[in-house]
Amino acid sequence: MADPASYRPQTGEIPTNPGVYRFRDPHGRVIYVGKAKSLRSRLNSYFANPGGLLPKTYAMVHAASSVEWTVVASELESLQLEYTWIKEFKPRFNVVFRDDKTYPYLAVTMGEKFPRVQVLRGERRKGTRYFGPYTAGAIRETMDTLLRVFPVRSCSPGVLKRAQASGRPCLLGYIDKCAAPCVGRVTPEEHRALAEDFCSFMGGEAKRFIGRLEKDMAAAVAELDYERAARVRDDIIALRKVFERNAVVLAEDTDADVFALHEDELEAAVQVFHVRGGRVRGQRGWVVEKVEDFTTPDLVEHLLQQVYGEEGETQGRLPREVLVPEEPSNAAELAQWLAGLRGAKVDIRVPRRGDKAALMSTVRENAEHALKLHKSRRAGDLTNRSLALQELQEALDLPVALLRIECFDISHVQGTNVVASMVVVEDGLPKKSDYRKFSITGAAAVDDTAAMHDVLTRRFRNYLQEKAAQAEAAQLPGHQAALEAMAVASMQDTTTPAPRAKFAYPPNLVVVDGGKPQVNAAARALAELGIDDVYVVGLAKRLEEVWLPDSDFPVILPRTSEGLYLLQRIRDEAHRFAITFHRQKRGKAMTVSALDSVPGLGEAKRKALLAQFGSVKSIRTASAAELATAKGIGPSLADAIVSHFSNGAAASGAEAPSINMTTGEIIET
């Protein structure tokens, strides 16, 4: 661990202006981002008395090796820049509000051609609108009820594709719980309108739809169409059943998010009730570990910044009013920022009396229970993870803590479609954003040891190249000023995805799936690159033996060892990730077509040609002028297709049919 005094800047070097600062570790990775009204005052607080810092802050300043700062013109700019950098760098020590994944959400995938209604847990996806959370039983009942009135697609992509191919809808299409856009019963536009109505109802516009259905029922009765009137009546009953589940808690015109929190010295639990049209439409929860000695206003500020920053990107459904337990720091600037995301005014208020204060008390009770539940669950989980990492470090006699572990696995079928996977574990938990896949070809695909050597060489060669590039860039004149200018210029942009991390951060331990040959191949790859601070082990299947490089005998860990269990989980995750990629690659190779090798002809254009001409045989005999009439096929590409087939026929002397390699069926006739 670094001594903070070794990189502490001179007090006179630090400006007193507002700004944003970044702590970096020895590998150059940003590990913490913060903002301050006075950079000098805030940064000096980290170095004046390190022993008096909170445990996590103490760990942060000792894990860092440098600190940088950027001066901005106002506190609003510092708020925006801090959010931008946290989103870009994902610093490990920053306050992160982790979703409570106990309850599922009702989600509508509006980003798809045919929007799909489904039940989802976990992280939010772009282009998807969420409602809830609900209990598992309630959400299934709600979804089943609403599909009677709004028959939106709810099937998986595989079921949709099979229905499109066969021309027959699934069971839900036959029982009128799906409009069956897959077979053309409704157009994509009509189906999207159904999905929009579904979202509007869940968003609080229930009375509008119930009123519309009541008019339809009255019209059906007037026309003596009693069967249709009965169906509409049943739809009204179904909608009222869903509508009445949410009790009225505030005035009917109230749209607000009500936040409350319960905290101790190290953690805080946050709960929010989403009130739309005076009714509670959803509830969410987070738990956060404190890094600095945050006050409640500081926590509220970071909470709103993260929650609405993400929702502003994906949903744009910020309410008119945000109720909080205490006024956040920089409340005026925060309200201005939220108004920019919403496109209209947002009021941040602290309820003092009345119905809103009573609802705030209820939300606070939920936060208190959530923190108790989190601590009881986390106690066992954190203890086991810490024990596993400590056992592994001691059993392998490693001098460094295992902060980051990477595991590699090779997957193939009899030497075909050889692929490899890299999975990452940090602090005992998977870090899926750092997972990587490798395709292996040529001499490296001969056997597992050659493949393992190739993958480790590629991974760590990239690490060395990126490390060298960063070092060269840091030495260029004006590099720091250029970085700051780019950051300030981009801080208004909260919609651009953060750049994907590559290989710039090395592991403490590499685990390979295999025994002595695979371990030695991996160790040889590292030695050839001159890397001597990354340790390598292998976990052999069946006997679960742990192998070290150039060792004649394995390390045997007890079957009850938490360290062995951690290695097994990492190995199994790497195997799952590798075999999934292998199956994807093998599946693409299953269907072979003469169109696949035409230069410049992608999948969409191949489909357009087949849709217009019916078969590869017809495409082969068509002229360039005829081919150019297909969607997306220009004159130059049409000439290339004709030339490709002419050259292929001359070379082979015969036409090779397209074959489905799974069934052996000849695709074209």
Swiss-Prot record:
Top-level taxon in the UniProt lineage: Bacteria
The alphabetized UniProt keywords are:
Cytoplasm, DNA damage, DNA excision, DNA repair, Excision nuclease, SOS response
**A Pfam family per the record:** GIY-YIG
Subcellular localization(s) per the UniProt record:
Cytoplasm
Q: A cellular component term (GO) from this record?
A: excinuclease repair complex
Q: Which GO terms describe its molecular function?
A: DNA binding; excinuclease ABC activity
Matching entries from InterPro entries are given as: GIY-YIG_endonuc, GIY-YIG_endonuc_sf, GIY-YIG_UvrC_Cho, Hlx-hairpin-Hlx_DNA-bd_motif, RuvA_2-like, UVR_dom, UVR_dom_sf, UvrABC_protein_C
Note whether DNA damage occurs among the keywords: yes
- Indicate the segments forming the UVR domain, all copies: 207-242
Report the residue ranges that make up the GIY-YIG domain in this protein: 16-95
| GO aspect biological process, one term | SOS response
The UniProt function text for this chain reads: The UvrABC repair system catalyzes the recognition and processing of DNA lesions. UvrC both incises the 5' and 3' sides of the lesion. The N-terminal half is responsible for the 3' incision and the C-terminal half is responsible for the 5' incision.
> How does it associate, per the subunit comment?
Interacts with UvrB in an incision complex.
Assigned protein family = Belongs to the UvrC family.
Which HAMAP family does the record match to this protein? UvrC (MF_00203)
Q: What is this protein called?
A: UvrABC system protein C
Organism of origin is: Arthrobacter sp. (strain FB24)
Query: Which gene name does the record give?
Result: uvrC
